[in-house]
Amino acid sequence: MFLWLAHFSNWLTGLNIFQYTTFRAVMAALTALAFSLMFGPWTIRRLTALKCGQAVRTDGPQTHLVKNGTPTMGGSLILTAITVSTLLWGNWANPYIWILLGVLLATGALGFYDDWRKVVYKDPNGVSAKFKMVWQSSVAIIAGLALFYLAANSANNILIVPFFKQIALPLGVVGFLVLSYLTIVGTSNAVNLTDGLDGLATFPVVLVAAGLAIFAYVSGHYQFSQYLQLPYVAGANEVAIFCTAMCGACLGFLWFNAYPAQVFMGDVGALALGAALGTVAVIVRQEFVLVIMGGLFVVEAVSVMLQVGWYKKTKKRIFLMAPIHHHYEQKGWKETQVVVRFWIITIVLVLIGLSTLKIR
């Protein structure tokens, strides 16, 4: 919204700063951060008053039983902060902004309904897996179709392989939709599975969003994208504003979500943030880079699939407990040790992902 102030730069030279993406990206992060910090205490009080306490699974780690009753659905604060900040600092004429907000809020609505059922019926399982998959699939397919339609040229419909500048595979509409679906739905569920310890998913989301913000800015800048041999995606620079808003909102939320957590983001936050990250990766054509930078999310999801699949086949478990962060808890790691060590791993993975900008 503030972008329109740049039109009055002829009257007041200083207003010209509002046309710069970098300035608006920084301000989007600070605005979302301030919003989360300002309304965090109020949100926690309201959730507590509404008795929106987390129902902890009795078959999980016994150390988690003390978390029973901790307010959940705090992700609604994150989504509100992202939406407000993006609308304030983003370009409303950019279709990517509306697609991202649409995906964020649509999957957030699913998560909200899931959390609501858990709170009202005291059922840790929430909505059925079938209902959740149908909703996520619908959002991913609609977003994929919209992004394919917006593709200005064939360069926006290719599969980029990191570290190899000569490998770029054309996808076509079917391939594009399949890849978009897997990326958006897969990341949404992976982040949700990761959100099992205080702050475990929140800070990695910040790191991955920051990394994708850099890719978005570069991809939306013709000279930079050509120099780094990345596909030029017109308008993708505005996506960086959405990403930095996500960074700020999650950092502000982490203030209250750090151990011992005063509030959990719940499915309303985790499902939405994951889907948004996946959508950003599709826009900038960096699905494989997302797999690298979000390696923690991938490992968490794969650990669950391996555990379930192997148990169904052999009635034995690969891990002491899945997702894998619970495995390390069962091995004797403190919750804070698991969280910080997984953060460190994510920092390394994001740096590796950023190295693909130049190493080709």
From Swiss-Prot:
Bilayer topology term: Multi-pass membrane protein
Cofactor(s) of this protein: Mg(2+)
Assigned EC number: 2.7.8.13
Coarse class of the protein's main subcellular location: membrane
Transmembrane segments: 24-44, 69-89, 92-112, 133-153, 158-178, 199-219, 239-259, 263-283, 288-308, 337-357
GO CC, one annotated term: plasma membrane
Catalysis: reaction(s): UDP-N-acetyl-alpha-D-muramoyl-L-alanyl-gamma-D-glutamyl-meso-2,6-diaminopimeloyl-D-alanyl-D-alanine + di-trans,octa-cis-undecaprenyl phosphate = di-trans,octa-cis-undecaprenyl diphospho-N-acetyl-alpha-D-muramoyl-L-alanyl-D-glutamyl-meso-2,6-diaminopimeloyl-D-alanyl-D-alanine + UMP
GO biological process, any: peptidoglycan biosynthetic process
Pathway membership: Cell wall biogenesis; peptidoglycan biosynthesis
Main function: Catalyzes the initial step of the lipid cycle reactions in the biosynthesis of the cell wall peptidoglycan: transfers peptidoglycan precursor phospho-MurNAc-pentapeptide from UDP-MurNAc-pentapeptide onto the lipid carrier undecaprenyl phosphate, yielding undecaprenyl-pyrophosphoryl-MurNAc-pentapeptide, known as lipid I.
Entry similarity comment: Belongs to the glycosyltransferase 4 family. MraY subfamily.
Protein name stated in the entry: Phospho-N-acetylmuramoyl-pentapeptide-transferase
